[in-house]
């Protein structure tokens, strides 16, 4: 099986798989600058902390700030709900943009790996560092790819989030 490794949002073409890739998405009635913004908006317990995160000057700084939240600022149940939220955010991202839909579907059966370079707990959860990690972002993308491919089998157009 072939493998597609991605990490930096600026790397063509598969940097678009990064949550830091700058592409607006509509999620839960709000327009977010990136899928990272949509994902992290669910993490804070307090609206003031959410606003502070959403005002970060870049998606990378947003991610760093969100990873450093104190436990009392994190929504109850986040550790168990975050994967479902990421699944929903990715579905919104890849169904709202035909080019991203085609890019994901075009990876065929390749293993998708977020290949991080800095070894830490977060990078080993969402990706792999030196081949070690759960690669949850890659796993969720492959799950979404299979779902979208099955839904698209009888259609000539991409699936919209409303469908």
Language model: regions and residue ranges:
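Charged, low-complexity intrinsically disordered segments
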Residues: 1-163
């Amino acid at each position: 099986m072939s493998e597609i490794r991605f990490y930096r949002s600026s790397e063509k073409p598969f940097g678009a798989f990064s949550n830091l890739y700058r592409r607006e998405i509509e999620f839960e009635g709000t327009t977010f600058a990136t899928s990272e913004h949509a994902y992290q908006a669910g993490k804070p317990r307090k609206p003031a902390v959410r606003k502070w995160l959403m005002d970060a000057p870049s998606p990378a700084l947003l991610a760093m700030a969100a990873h450093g939240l104190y436990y009392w600022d994190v929504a109850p149940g986040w550790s168990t709900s975050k994967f479902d939220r990421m699944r929903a955010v990715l579905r919104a991202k890849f169904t709202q943009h035909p080019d991203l839909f085609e890019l994901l579907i075009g990876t065929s059966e390749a293993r998708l790996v977020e290949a991080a370079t800095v070894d830490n707990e977060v990078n080993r959860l969402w990706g792999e560092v030196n081949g070690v990690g759960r690669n949850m972002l890659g796993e969720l993308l492959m799950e979404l790819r299979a779902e979208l491919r099955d839904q698209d089998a009888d259609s000539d157009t991409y699936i919209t989030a409303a469908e």
